[in-house]
Curated annotation (Swiss-Prot):
Mg(2+) binds at S173, T193. InterPro entries: G_OBG, GTP-bd, GTP-bd_Obg/CgtA, GTP1-OBG_CS, GTP1_OBG_dom, GTP1_OBG_dom_sf, OBG_GTPase, P-loop_NTPase. GO terms for molecular function: GTP binding; GTPase activity; magnesium ion binding. One of its GO terms (biological process) is ribosome biogenesis. An essential GTPase which binds GTP, GDP and possibly (p)ppGpp with moderate affinity, with high nucleotide exchange rates and a fairly low GTP hydrolysis rate. Plays a role in control of the cell cycle, stress response, ribosome biogenesis and in those bacteria that undergo differentiation, in morphogenesis control. Monomer. The gene is obg. It comes from Chlorobium luteolum (strain DSM 273 / BCRC 81028 / 2530) (Pelodictyon luteolum). This is GTPase Obg.
Amino acid sequence: MKFVDSASIFVQAGEGGRGCVSFRREKFVPKGGPDGGDGGNGGNVWLRTNSHLTTLLDFKYRKKYLAPRGSHGQGSRKSGRKGADIYIDVPCGTLVRNAATQELLADMTGDGEEVMIARGGHGGRGNQHFATSTNQAPRRSEPGWKGEELQLDMELKLMADVGLVGFPNAGKSTLISVLSAARPKIADYPFTTLVPNLGIVRYEEYKSFVMADIPGIIEGAAEGRGLGLQFLRHIERTKILAVLVSADAEDVEAEYQTLVGELEKFGRGLDEKPRILVVTKMDIAPEDFTLPAPGDEVHVLAISSVAGMGLKELKDELWREVSMRDRPEESSDPEGEGDGGTP
């Protein structure tokens, strides 16, 4: 399936139904009063997250979503039926903006989350509402109100706990395929990964975390070079970054610093995320290879996805970091002795 992470659609809520002009018809009542019913409200437009969706591809083929109008009012004070609401399913992690103003309307992260994005128009009033002491038989009613309409810009940011960052051929795809059931394309040439991949990493009993592999970034990515920059948004929501550098690199620490520099240039909080340095392909490391010490309290791990070396230690470290950031913050006043308390 083609991966699409941005789309623009037009949505229009339903118009309200017309109010009715009608008069009571009863035997022996030659001049019955007005009894025109109100029109029904138009249908609303909702956005709803669906965890089974992973792309905005559907919106490349369907650009307009229109909710039904409300039914018109009828005689005998019968109101029209409300127009049916429509629901538009989107992947978890979708941001929705008003295309005209770029105002953020919704940031939808949880499965099954629903947001009303356009409200249907009110139904018009029937002539029963316009009778007065001087006009007992009004022939006036109201048309329905128009429903809200707007153009939406949608952007997908994948939901993951761990983001893999590295130069092309650093071993990101191999690692995610070994740790999870994800099966990205793997080959011995640069830019094998052309779209982000998600994998669920199982950890001990009943525990798991989600890992995201994005296309490799290169020096100058912040200025638009390479493929990785356009996909960096997909690791903005992660709790920790694993920066992968191959052990056969000319200078492992220099590559690490280059990658960190690109994250800093991109901004949007990526440079502030906790990170670990993962030195990959240790099975082909030179005999005199030594692990770098980049400082800044960065934990350094050495692994080989092919040989299985260091993978348990890596999973342990990633789980520790993820679970630590999942915990609710502890109260700074555990004894309940803060000022102003009631005994």
